[in-house]
């Protein structure tokens, strides 16, 4: 009961900040006014007074009144009424010394002030910094020292001084390296580190909030802030050592001063230390890792057997295990396979790439399982070293239940390579062949080049007109022949007869062509071009033609967009057509559709024009003007 009364007295002397810390530590609501917080704290003390809560109350009270802690005997004296003596005291009551009274008892309400400054933290606590793999410590310039904070102000300031010995100065100067851009760097550096003031385990680097550092009166650059993880969060700097060598006085006679400013936090203290270190490279760490030796392959085989051992309680059993020989970091073949002792997987990563990545940004995280993989726990796997030396043509292996392995070669699927289809101006035409072997038909391929003809060739060498005799019967299709793919300059079914009449260029140039507008839009560069000027170099020949396909009729229909042809256009052709062609050309066979250009000037049968009544054109066929 005496201890409970002592704890109650301690709680009643707390301020709002101590009450909030106590309630937050116990997981209770810490919002409200002081009397509400005090009632919650007393209820906590009566309901569940756990040992951790009791220790927290005593810790807060020691921080609140660091000089004197009241004991049970002192509390009994304070509980007696004035002028009375305790039981068994023969003499009169002696006055209670002021040091035994709590500061709150000497002052009235609302006059709570700190009568004594808080007890300073130890200057050199037993704080040890966690060693950094890329730095080798040569000397300790400032031992881990507490950044003392007072409750009187928000921002704190501390001053430190250190000096270099002549030997240390010589080491720093001889390690200077000139870098591109008129900069210099030192392999041996003066390193400043911050951490939490905790003695339970080696501490990692940790910056106080709102930190500012001045070395010899010059502001020291600090690592940039990390992006906040959530909105409203206070930005933090990445915790890493600070190189203050460029700002230090490299002299054995002049000391160096450090001024640190930071924001104090309730219940959290920080520590500062300065070291003389030598910076190492990834290659040096790789050599040190090789010097540690290669782990026995039997360890990995035992791990494989353990993973592949069948579980009697499980219905699914793993009989094999595939492992890649490619590094998950660089996607290249492993050269120095390593992994951490804390990793439970067999997959290894390349030690050289892992060290190079941590040299740029020290995270020391396993790329396979994303767990911590510090440099001290890295080992080189001897089993993978044997596999890499004996199997150089595969990138994946498979482990068996007995610890053996076999290479996994990729399956090569035979794929037929199809020739890409030809797109362009050049085309192929298969000529029909009668009978014969089908293999010979495939070999006979005629390649047609559509780009050999140009306007310049036409102007230099005008094409000669070929005249063919008129045949009255249709050409029968060859038996067994395939379809013919036709393109420009292919022999068509239009057969020409010898020239029967000529027509001068002056006649064509005098035709009133403006009466027949084109049925399709023409470009501006073609509208002003005289197309008939190309036809005046040679007189045109006319002859009867036999149209043996409906496609050519449609082509002529698009060529003659007009239906009624003026008599003055085809009038001069009537005598020639009537006298020479009608008697020489026999009538078309039944079922053959032909287009006849009559003197009356109309396309018949195929184009729906009126038929002439004269007997002179019976059985005659029209002449087609050949422009090629």
Curated annotation (Swiss-Prot):
Residue numbers covered by motif LXXLL motif: 19-23
Signal peptide: none
GO annotation (BP), single: negative regulation of transcription by RNA polymerase II
PROSITE patterns reported for this sequence: PINIT (PS51466), SAP (PS50800), ZF_SP_RING (PS51044)
Subcellular location: Cytoplasm; Nucleus; Nucleus speckle
Known EC number: 2.3.2.-
Main subcellular localisation: cytoplasm
Domain annotation PINIT: ranges: 115-280
Position of the Glycyl lysine isopeptide (Lys-Gly) (interchain with G-Cter in SUMO2) cross-link: 46, 56, 230, 307, 466, 482
One Gene Ontology molecular-function label: SUMO transferase activity
Zinc finger feature spans (SP-RING-type): 312-393
Keywords on record: Cytoplasm, Isopeptide bond, Metal-binding, Nucleus, Transcription, Transcription regulation, Transferase, Ubl conjugation, Ubl conjugation pathway, Zinc, Zinc-finger
Binding of Zn(2+), residues: 343, 345, 366, 369
Record domain SAP: where: 11-45
SUMO1-binding: annotated segments: 450-460
InterPro entries in the cross-refs: PINIT, PINIT_sf, SAP_dom, SAP_dom_sf, Znf_MIZ, Znf_RING/FYVE/PHD
Region span, Disordered: 597-617
Induction: By dihydrotestosterone (DHT) in prostate cancer cells.
One GO cellular component, as annotated: postsynaptic cytosol
Assembly notes: Monomer. Binds SUMO1 and UBE2I. Interacts with BCL11A, HMGA2, IRF1, MITF and NCOA2. Interacts with STAT5; the interaction occurs on stimulation by PRL. Interacts with GFI1; the interaction relieves the inhibitory effect of PIAS3 on STAT3-mediated transcriptional activity. Interacts with AR, PLAG1 and ZFHX3. Interacts with STAT3; the interaction occurs on stimulation by IL6, CNTF or OSM and inhibits the DNA binding activity of STAT3. Interacts with MTA1. Interacts with CCAR2 (via N-terminus). Interacts with TRIM8. Interacts with PRDM1/Blimp-1.
Family, as annotated: Belongs to the PIAS family.
Record's protein name: E3 SUMO-protein ligase PIAS3
Species per Swiss-Prot/TrEMBL record: Homo sapiens
Gene that encodes it: PIAS3
């Amino acid at each position: 009961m005496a201890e409970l009364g002592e704890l109650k007295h301690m709680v009643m002397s707390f301020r709002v900040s101590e009450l909030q810390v106590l309630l937050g530590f116990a997981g209770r609501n810490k919002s409200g006014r002081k009397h509400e917080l005090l009632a919650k704290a007393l209820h906590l003390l009566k309901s569940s007074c756990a040992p951790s809560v009791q220790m927290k109350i005593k810790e807060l009270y020691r921080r609140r009144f660091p000089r004197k802690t009241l004991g049970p005997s002192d509390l009994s004296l304070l509980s007696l009424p004035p002028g009375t003596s305790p039981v068994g005291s023969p003499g009169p009551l002696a006055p209670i010394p002021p040091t035994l009274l709590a500061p709150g008892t000497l002052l009235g309400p609302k006059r709570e002030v700190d009568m004594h400054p808080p007890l300073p933290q130890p200057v050199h606590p037993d704080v040890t910094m966690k060693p950094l793999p890329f730095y080798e410590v040569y000397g300790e310039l400032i031992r881990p020292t507490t950044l003392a904070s007072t409750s009187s102000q928000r921002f704190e300031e501390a001053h430190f001084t250190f000096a270099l010995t002549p030997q240390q100065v010589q080491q720093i100067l001889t390690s200077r390296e000139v870098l591109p851009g008129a900069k210099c760097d030192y392999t041996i550096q003066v390193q400043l580190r911050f951490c939490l003031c905790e003695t339970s385990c080696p501490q990692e680097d940790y910056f106080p909030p709102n930190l500012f550092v001045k070395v010899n009166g010059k502001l020291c650059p600090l690592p940039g802030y990390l992006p906040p993880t959530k909105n409203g969060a206070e930005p933090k700097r990445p915790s890493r050592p600070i190189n203050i060598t460029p700002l230090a006085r490299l002299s054995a006679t002049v000391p160096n001063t450090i001024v640190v400013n930071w924001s104090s936090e309730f219940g959290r203290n920080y520590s500062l230390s300065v070291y003389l270190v030598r910076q190492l490279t990834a290659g040096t760490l790789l050599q040190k890792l090789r010097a540690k030796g290669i782990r026995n392959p039997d360890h990995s085989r035992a791990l494989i057997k353990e993973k592949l051992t069948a579980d009697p309680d499980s219905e699914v059993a793993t009989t094999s295990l595939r492992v890649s020989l490619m590094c998950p970091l660089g996607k290249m073949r492993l050269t120095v396979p390593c992994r951490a002792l804390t990793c439970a997987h067999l997959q290894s990563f390349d030690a050289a790439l892992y060290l190079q990545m941590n040299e740029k940004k020290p995270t020391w995280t396993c790329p396979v399982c994303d767990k911590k993989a510090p440099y001290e726990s890295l080992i080189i796997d001897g089993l993978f070293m044997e596999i890499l030396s004996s199997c150089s043509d595969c990138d994946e292996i498979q482990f068996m239940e007995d610890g053996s392995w076999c290479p996994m070669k990729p399956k090569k699927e035979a794929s037929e390579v199809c020739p890409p289809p030809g797109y362009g101006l050049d085309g192929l035409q298969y000529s029909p062949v009668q009978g014969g072997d089908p293999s010979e038909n495939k070999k006979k391929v005629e390649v047609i080049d559509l780009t050999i003809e140009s306007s310049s060739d036409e102007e230099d060498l005008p094409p000669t007109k070929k005249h063919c005799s008129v045949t009255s019967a249709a050409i029968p299709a060859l038996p067994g022949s395939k379809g013919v793919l036709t393109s420009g300059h292919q022999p068509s079914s239009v057969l020409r007869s010898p020239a029967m009449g000529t027509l001068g260029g002056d006649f064509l140039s005098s035709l009133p062509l403006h009466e027949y507008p084109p049925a399709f839009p023409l470009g501006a560069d073609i509208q002003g071009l005289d197309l008939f000027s190309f036809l005046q170099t040679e007189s045109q020949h006319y002859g009867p033609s036999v149209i043996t396909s409906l496609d050519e009729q449609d082509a002529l229909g698009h060529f003659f967009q007009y239906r009624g042809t003026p008599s003055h256009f085809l009038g001069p052709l009537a005598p020639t057509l009537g006298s020479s062609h009608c008697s020489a050309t026999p009538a078309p066979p039944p079922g053959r559709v032909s287009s006849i250009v009559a003197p009356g000037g109309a396309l018949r049968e195929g184009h729906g024009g009126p038929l002439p009544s004269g007997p002179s054109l019976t059985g005659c066929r029209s002449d087609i003007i050949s422009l090629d």
